[in-house]
């Protein structure tokens, strides 16, 4: 009988083999073709595909020399959360403590909270060691960063000043207290200080990647900066956003304006005005233009709201409700978010004890959860038909994979950040288009793209 380490290694080998088979299918290489081109035996290729032998670095290096593929294509994501949930205790967080100086003085104490190789979070517990005596945005004791690539949701504990550059590149300061929250976009310079000399302020700085991480970022970096930058359209207003989308889709179809006019019966002057952001198109115009470009109308629609790059949400302005509707075990408090990231949701959840054995949640997003209360809570969940339980102490943090059935029992308070990563949205729509029948092959390829024995197609 295999131990857990051997079982995990076996699963990783199988996934690696399925990934390798997917690459061969995409390149239209049969196993025997790959064996001949890589200079190895068909038996070894078959063992790799079947998950019985490791795909060696030597074979990968040969492959990238003869095929139009990248080294990263051959590596699968290591799953460090095999039961669907990962926990980091408050004590483990404390052991990761490091002091970071700015201008030669202690400025922040950083501590890790739970992270997973399969999740987009990079969350930190940060204590503000710099204390200020005023709320001036120009305070020279506040040492600014240069902004960073990741999106950031922040939950505030204690008296903290939050400094940031607004859209007009003016320094601003928000006076934050426990329960307040904010969202900040990538590359916006910012910093934090404490206002209370008796007790340093604290933040949960939950940074995370969205759609531009991983392969997308690599694809952009494979282009020149000049070429890659042109994918960034002007979304500064609704009119400019709409105009940029209309022009982009027309140009990638190599359609002259007069041809679009013929197809849509929209006057050329009107199309020119729309592409110059003179006005927003009507719903009927969007439908006609979408048909002429052979796209869905959603591709041509500007966002309903042009959100600010920094969203500050005082606790007393947050909406509240109870969930589930009947039992009302949880009080939800809606924290800072932005419509620009529709699959990012932040909440404070007040848990009220229940004897119910029901799993109250099944969420199709990655979840970071931090126990900000004073009481321990019980987390119950189910994964692959097995039931699990963990005690969540104050200061503990947990990661929960998407679609895990779970609940919390006890009386306490949690901060929860849910994010989509790279799957919800366009990737989800594409997977839905492929359909449930083919989902398994889309995730992990299980067969060659054709049957060499010419068997009849099984459509059942």
Q: What positions do the PLM features span?
A:
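Short acidic-glycine-tyrosine-enriched beta hairpin
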Residues: 113, 165-188, 194, 335, ...
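A short, N-terminal "cap"/entry segment at the start of jelly-roll beta-barrel domains
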Residues: 69-132, 235-238, 283-286, 291-352, ...
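Conserved double-stranded beta-helix
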Residues: 208-247, 422-460
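Short alpha-helical "recognition helix" segments of helix-turn-helix
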Residues: 30-38, 45, 256-263, 289
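Short, conserved beta-strand element in jelly-roll/cupin
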Residues: 127-132, 144-166, 206, 349-353, ...
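A short hydrophobic beta-strand segment most commonly corresponding to one strand
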Residues: 123-127, 181-183, 196-219, 343-349, ...
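Recognition helix of helix-turn-helix/homeodomain-like DNA-binding domains
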Residues: 39-64, 77, 265-281
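A short, Lys/Arg-rich alpha-helix, primarily the initiator
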Residues: 1-30, 229-253
């Amino acid at each position: 009988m295999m131990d857990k380490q051997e079982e995990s290694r076996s699963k990783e080998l199988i996934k690696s083999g399925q990934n390798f088979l997917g690459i061969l299918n995409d390149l239209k290489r049969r196993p025997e073709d790959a064996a001949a081109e890589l200079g190895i035996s068909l038996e070894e290729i078959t063992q790799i595909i079947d998950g019985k032998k490791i795909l060696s670095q030597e074979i990968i290096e040969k492959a990238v020399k003869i095929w139009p593929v990248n080294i990263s294509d051959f590596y699968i994501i290591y799953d460090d959360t095999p039961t669907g949930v990962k926990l980091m205790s408050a004590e483990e967080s404390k052991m990761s403590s490091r002091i970071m100086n700015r201008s030669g003085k202690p400025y922040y104490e950083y501590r890790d909270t739970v992270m997973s190789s399969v999740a987009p979070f990079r969350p930190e517990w940060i204590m503000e060691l710099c204390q200020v005596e005023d709320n001036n945005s120009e305070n020279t004791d506040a040492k600014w960063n240069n902004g960073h690539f990741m999106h950031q949701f922040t939950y505030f504990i204690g008296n903290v000043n939050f400094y940031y550059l607004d859209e007009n590149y003016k320094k601003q300061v928000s006076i934050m207290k426990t329960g307040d929250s904010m969202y900040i976009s990538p590359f916006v310079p910012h910093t934090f200080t404490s206002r209370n000399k008796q007790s340093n302020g604290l933040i949960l700085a939950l940074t995370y990647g969205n759609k531009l991480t991983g392969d997308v970022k690599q694809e952009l970096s494979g282009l020149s900066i000049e070429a890659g930058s042109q994918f960034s359209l002007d979304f500064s207003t609704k009119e400019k956003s709409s105009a940029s989308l209309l022009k982009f889709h027309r140009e990638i179809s190599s359609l002259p304006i007069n041809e679009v006019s013929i197809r849509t019966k929209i006057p050329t002057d009107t199309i020119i005005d729309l592409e110059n952001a003179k006005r927003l198109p009507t719903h009927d115009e969007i439908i006609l233009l979408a048909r002429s470009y052979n796209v869905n109308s959603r591709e041509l629609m500007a966002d309903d709201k042009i959100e600010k790059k920094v969203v500050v949400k005082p606790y007393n302005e947050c909406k509240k409700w109870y969930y589930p509707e009947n039992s009302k075990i949880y009080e939800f408090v809606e924290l800072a978010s932005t419509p620009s990231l529709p699959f990012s949701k932040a909440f404070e959840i007040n848990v009220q004890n229940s004897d119910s054995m029901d799993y109250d949640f099944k969420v199709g997003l990655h979840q970071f959860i931090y126990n900000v209360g004073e009481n321990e809570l019980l987390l119950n969940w189910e994964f692959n038909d097995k039931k699990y339980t963990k005690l969540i102490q104050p200061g503990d943090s947990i990661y929960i994979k998407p679609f895990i059935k779970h609940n919390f029992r006890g009386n306490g308070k949690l901060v929860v950040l849910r994010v989509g990563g790279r799957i919800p949205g366009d990737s989800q729509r594409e997977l839905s288009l492929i359909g449930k029948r083919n989902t398994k092959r889309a995730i992990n390829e299980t067969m060659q793209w054709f049957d060499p024995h010419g068997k009849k197609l099984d459509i059942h």
